Each structure stands twice: as C-alpha cells, then as structure tokens.
C-alpha cells in the first residue's frame, strides 16, 4: 500500500542520497545523518517510511563498505536482504526461547543461578 501524500523534504533528501549509492559503494548512514543532522533512530524511521509508504526497495550492507543502496538486480537485492533475514531468524529464536521459559519456575529457582 502506498501513502497518499508527497514525500517530506527530509524523505526526499534521504531518498536522493541513497539513490546515488550502489551495492559496491553504498551511502554510509553516518554521511546521511551528518548531512541532515539526524539521529540514528530518525534515519531508520525515514528509511522505513520510504520502504513502506513509497515502496522504495532500500537495503543495507552491514559490512565494509557499509551503508544504504537500492538494488539494481536480484543478486544485489539478495545480498542486501541477507542481513535482515539473519536478524529475523535471531529474533524468532529469542522470541521462542523467552516464550518457552516457565516464569514461575524461573523465579522459584533464580537463587540457583
């Protein structure tokens, strides 16, 4: 679903920056944050808005050179999605473990830890 509004100036500026990146030379988050005086959380929110509201397929490299880019083919998309897939698997594992812990048993036996 796309949003029925225009991009904010900040969204447009961030989009322009990321658009100039490539898989080989992604745009570092620090560069974008520094240029527009944004916190890490603000940039993450803008990137999420661009993805969800405007359907821009922004991905990120988590290793050097790290940063944001828009994939130009399926190989680049797969490379950019790999860190997100690993993160989801880790979070699913954490969720499963936390949900499976018997809280009463934990608190009754916490002194044994």
Regions found by a protein language model. Give the residues of each.
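Short helix-capping/hinge SLiMs at alpha-helix to coil transitions
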Residues: 18-25, 39
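Short amphipathic alpha-helical interaction segments
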Residues: 38-49
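Minor-groove-contacting beta-hairpin "wing" of winged helix-turn-helix DNA-binding domains
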Residues: 62-72
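Short alpha-helical segments that sit at the start of domains
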Residues: 1-16
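Nucleotide-sugar-dependent glycosyltransferase catalytic core
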Residues: 70-80
């Amino acid at each position: 679903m796309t949003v029925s509004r225009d991009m904010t100036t900040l969204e447009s500026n961030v989009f322009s920056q990321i658009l100039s990146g490539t898989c080989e030379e992604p745009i570092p988050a620090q560069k974008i944050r520094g240029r527009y005086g944004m916190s890490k959380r603000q940039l993450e929110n803008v990137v999420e808005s661009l993805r969800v509201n405007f359907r821009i397929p922004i991905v990120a490299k988590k290793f050097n050179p790290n940063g944001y880019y828009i994939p130009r083919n399926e190989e680049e998309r797969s490379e950019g999605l790999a860190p997100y897939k690993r993160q989801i698997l880790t979070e699913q594992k954490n969720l499963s473990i936390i949900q499976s812990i018997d809280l009463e048993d934990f608190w009754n036996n916490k002194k044994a830890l």
